[in-house]
Each structure stands twice: as C-alpha cells, then as structure tokens.
Amino acid sequence: MTGEGSATILLGIDPGSRITGYGVVDVATPTPRYVASGCIRIKSDQLAQKLAQVYAGIGELIGLHRPHEIAIEQVFMSKNADSALKLGQARGTAIVCAANHGLEVFEYAPTQIKQAVTGTGAATKEQVQHMVTAILGLDGVPQADAADALAIALTHAYARQGRSLPPSRGRRRSGSRQRWRDYRPS
C-alpha cells in the first residue's frame, strides 16, 4: 500500500504518550485539501496500555482514511529525559503500526515542520495553528496537537512537490502583507 507517485492521502502524526495528534490531507491536486484531524487521547496510566492505545488508534485511522504515506515528527531533545523516552516510545509504536500496514513513514524535524508551514523554524504553536488554518481554509482553529499533525502532513506534501514553503492561500490585499513578527494570537 505504499504510494509510489500515486499517493494522494497523507496522514501526519504528532506522537505523544498522553495525546497523539493526527491530521489527514488529500494532495491529489497541487493545493492540499483537509480531510480530517483530531487527537487520540490516552486513557491509561500504564505504559504498555498507553502504547497499545496509540497503536490501536493509529490502526483505526489507517483503516478509516486509507493513507498512502505517513509523516511523523522526529524526536527532539528534551531537558526531561523521561519525557523524551516516553515520546520516543509512542513514536516508535506509531511507526511500527504504519509498517505493519505496509506504509512508508517519512520523518521531519520540528524546525523543518515550522519552516515549511510558517516560513520560520522558530514559530510558536499558535503561529503553526494560525497558518494551518489559513493554508487549509479551515473554519476554526484546530487543537494544538491536531494542528501540529496537519502541519506534519503539509510538510510532507511540500517535500513531495519539491517545495519548502507553502503558497499563499489567503486573499492578498494591496499594500498590506502580514508578517510573523506582527502576528498576535487572539
């Protein structure tokens, strides 16, 4: 089920041991189209059960949306070693689930994702949410983990097209251009 040149449905995953965000986009046309997003909320305190819930949730998403490729965020260095280890375990669980479904997995660093979606690798979560909403033409702002997962899927879409930055999706007003340093979340 790998997508060699014909992949149109991409699943982005923002792994976590408590909340795993997901975002599904269709890239059949040059402009990515929103399909779905949300969060897998982990209800257990036991590690094995947490990982089983991540695996089951990702498996359910794969069955429902039939993605051709999966993109996931790479582990970033954390000051808290325990948190980084738990994140790595959740991430590994998602990768194994994808592999067991015959899907190719693509990995992107957090700074690559922010750069691709916002134009700067130092973007805040709010800036990522704002740009994901604008790029996909969403009516509302997705929850942070879901927005991150959509940003991961968009990053993969842009990488597949050989682009590093997204095209402008909003109407451009003459004489006005929004800059990130001017953006203030509501």
UniProtKB/Swiss-Prot annotation:
Subcellular location: Cytoplasm
Pfam families assigned: RuvC
Record GO terms (molecular function): crossover junction DNA endonuclease activity; DNA binding; magnesium ion binding
Catalytic function, reaction form: Endonucleolytic cleavage at a junction such as a reciprocal single-stranded crossover between two homologous DNA duplexes (Holliday junction)
Residues the entry annotates as binding Mg(2+) 1: D14, D145
Spans through the membrane: none
EC number of the protein: 3.1.21.10
Residue positions binding Mg(2+) 2: E73
Residues of the active site: D14, E73, D145
Annotated family: Belongs to the RuvC family.
PANTHER family for this protein: CROSSOVER JUNCTION ENDODEOXYRIBONUCLEASE RUVC
Name of protein: Crossover junction endodeoxyribonuclease RuvC
Species this chain originates from: Chromohalobacter salexigens (strain ATCC BAA-138 / DSM 3043 / CIP 106854 / NCIMB 13768 / 1H11)
Taxon lineage: Bacteria, Pseudomonadati, Pseudomonadota, Gammaproteobacteria, Oceanospirillales
